[in-house]
Curated annotation (Swiss-Prot):
One of its GO terms (biological process) is alkanesulfonate catabolic process. Involved in the degradation of the organosulfur compound 2(S)-dihydroxypropanesulfonate (DHPS). Catalyzes the radical-mediated dehydration of DHPS to produce 3-sulfopropionaldehyde (3-oxopropane-1-sulfonate). InterPro entries: Gly_radical, GRE, PFL2/GDeHydtase_fam, PFL_dom. This is (2S)-3-sulfopropanediol dehydratase. It comes from Klebsiella oxytoca. One of its GO terms (cellular component) is cytosol. Pathway: Organosulfur degradation; alkanesulfonate degradation.
Amino acid sequence: MKVNHTTACGTQPFDKTYSLGYQVHHEDWSPYPRVNRLRQAFLDRPYDIDVERLRLVTEAYQKHEDAPRKLKCARAFENILLNTKLYIYDEDLILGEIAAPAKASPIYPEFSVNWIINEILHSPFEERANDQFYIRNDEERKEIVELCRYWEGKTVDDLINSRLEIDQTKGSEVGEKIFQTNLYHYAGAGHLAIDYARLMAVGYNGLIDNAQAGLEKLSKRDPEYGDKRDFYTAMIIELEAAKKYIARYAKLAQESAEKEENPQRKQELETMALNCQQIAGGVPQTFWQALQLFNFATTLIQIESNGHSISYGRMDQWLYPWFAADMKNNTITKEFALELIEVQYVKMNNPTKLKDKGTVAVRNGRGFGGESLTLGGVDREGNDATNDLTMLMLEGSAHTRMMNPWVCVRMHENTPYELKIKTVECIRAGYGHPKLFNDAPSIKGMMRKGMTLEEARDYCVVGCVELDLAGKEYGWHDAAYVNTPKMMEMVVNGGRSLSTGEQLGPDTGSLDTYKSFDEVLASVDQQFEYWTDQMCSSLNIIDNAHRELKPVPYVSAFYEDCMISGKDLTEGGAKYNGIAPQAAGMATCADSLATIKQLVFDEKRYSGAEMLQAVKDNWVGHEKLYALVNSSKVRHYGNDDDYADDLFKFMFECYCRHISGRKTPRGGEFSPGVYSVNANVGMGLNTNASIDGRKKFEPISDNMGPVHTDGGSHDICGPTALVNSLTKVDHSLATNGTLMNLRFPQEAVAGVEGRDNLLSFIDEYIAKQAMHVQFNIMSSATMRAAQKKPEDYKDMLVRVAGYSAYFVELGKPLQKDLIQRTELHF
């Protein structure tokens, strides 16, 4: 059925480079009145906690207490889908939520409950400084606590904590916080992208047929027969439940249409009912149906498990056949296709996730993490893959300007000028999207993980900057954060804490004992080896706990190798099975090493003992040295100075070497990343003063960026020098990605000259083989104004790290960190 729609008001022809010029006011970002109203409705809703999923999953686990683990998980998923309340919102064109109302967070007791009980009883969610959530009434508050009590001692978190050794916990988030592995304590299978193209080609019926065939082929001679039988049986239960869930929506939409008096809305509801009827088991026949199937497939992953960063893959590629067919058949216009895209973008913001207060104090955000959408790049043959949908999806991001999706544009030497111009115009609009990825080093990095050239060319982005092969790789990205300045603390102080003196790691020397700078570098290597051993062994324990307690048969259905092998994603069923922790604070370490090398060993102006005492004293009483270390008289990373840049390269390569190649329980290898997202702020709160001129509690350096302390920014030579420093390392060694934030004020990129300067800068950046870059087009003055009058800047998006967020919802320490980042000019 074709639905008639009014043309978007004020849009220009689609052959123009950009059609954003019509807008004037914030409330009119989109040319589609429907989209603006849906966007505003989202902003006006409160962040609630919803009890229904907790109630239904607990009910199922109690009923099937003695069932095999995979079947117990499957029956819980089924119970949710058959009984959860359904929601259709006014003017919505895409159906499906995450077993909770829009903007309300479900509860996932399978992973952890102790913090939920504790916060409800002692520090209510609604009283947090940021990321507040609200429980609707005292009855539900009491019910949540009572239901969570059932799960005490039975969660993934409980199992992990029972297995960690004291040497591992010394360095973890419950100890000195040298590394933080807690994401997968409370989160499920995430940081992944499924094979949407496969689902679109065969539908749920096809997936069920594949699972049934796998079940029938099993041999009782297979020593894993029982596990594989349970896997296929659980998968079939969950896929059948998905069909019934979508059919429930079809029925609700039809019933709503019968009651609707507005002819236009009645027709929309009837079409949505037909869409759901078609895709409940079959394949989509239209672009609208393909989008609808996409939304159901994704939200069902978020119902099964609460994994961060369920990403959308190369959406302009796998969705294009349905768009092209509708355009050829004249059953859709570009205007209506864009409206559907924008409605879907708004809907992507509905899922929210309750997190513990410790996490949100340092890593703001109430969403499911990095739900990235990848556009552009090359195809499997190496040719440019840009199409009309690439342009529409990028434009839709500019019209909606919300936290999700996290739009990524892949760039290469033959990226069309039209796409580059549209990308630059989006960046100049100042809402923090898109982020850019360089195909050459990214593809090289994927091949380092063992992928073929054709596979590597098909990479997508998951989460912030993590590189992934959709439907083939379960990379366990974002597995841990490594606070490298805390490791440096062990280097300068003999493996002891600067604040307590406790011996935490091996004594590999200290600043008052080293006789040469080579001894310092050797100590860095030894400390990195020791602490990465502790972290990686901890991550293997966590990985095994997920395999034992929380298999994911539904999401496994979208991985062909899981279907063939009869192994769940958590058991190593994917083709590529990594674990990927990332390092934070590299520039803090590099500048610390440069300071030691210059002032202690080369110029001999200060002794190692004097430097050590300065950081023990938090620089108090050492003001002259503090000023010197933060001045241009000391060599710093970010200024195209090999003296300091070579030490950044040393740190980068040291970390990558100690992570790469380690084996995972799922038969894959560890993969290093170098980025902090916004965790550098929280890490700084737990890090003593450092030799680079950073005082205690200040943020460590962010991502691949230079140092910014209260004593001053260490990069002083402009953007070109910064890029030259950044590209002296081989980014492909960081096979889990690198991240670079850059900030320009609006006037630096204004007008044709500003646009062309930014475009030329990006071209140069790509040519020099940097892997990633993202921009904040925001002045310090604007951010300070938002701090003073947050009510006037409620929907002001800023680029934080791999994601954008509403500035006024960020914690004060993170706001300060954003303001302190160097304001660059061409």
